[in-house]
Regions:
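A generic "folded-domain core" signal
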Residues: 15-140
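Sec-dependent N-terminal signal peptides
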Residues: 3-12
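Residue-level marker of intrinsically disordered, low-complexity segments enriched
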Residues: 2-3, 81
Length: 140
């Protein structure tokens, strides 16, 4: 029985938010429904990017949104998304509202057309703080 439980745990996606600082500042989180990656690379014209990869293809829709539910609830929308199969990406010069949404709320939901993927934020705050510290420091 213990072997089955161990195998089941290995087959499920990691539930923790993960921060890395190389080659660019990045924080990511994977669930059974998809993966969210936030990155900062000052070498790019639009240094901030958020990419949400679903288990299915995203629809072609005019507006992409991120809804943050919790104590500092907000919804952010844009028409600057790029859909590439199962991944929708948005790049910009600044992501202050996105960082605040991820750090200070309970869930983040990516919205495009009729599709929505939610990500729990219960362990996100420390990793978002590390991301903020990374973007404040120069990348070698």
């Amino acid at each position: 029985m213990r072997t089955l439980i161990a195998l089941a745990l290995l087959a499920t996606p990691a539930t923790a938010w993960e921060f890395t600082a190389s080659p660019a500042c990045m924080v990511s989180h994977e669930t059974a429904d998809g993966e969210l990656k936030l990155s900062y690379d000052p070498r790019l014209p639009d240094p901030y990017a958020i990419a949400v990869t679903a288990n299915t293809q995203w629809p072609d829709a005019p507006i992409f949104g991120m809804r943050f539910d919790g104590p500092s609830a907000l919804t952010i929308t844009t028409d600057r998304q790029i859909v590439d199969g199962p991944t929708v990406t948005v790049r910009d010069q600044s992501f202050g509202n996105v960082l605040n949404g991820l750090e200070f709320n309970a869930t983040a939901t990516a919205l495009l057309g009729d599709n929505a993927i939610s990500f729990p934020l219960n362990d996100a705050a420390p990793e978002i703080q590390r991301f903020r510290a990374c973007i404040a420091a120069p990348i070698a």
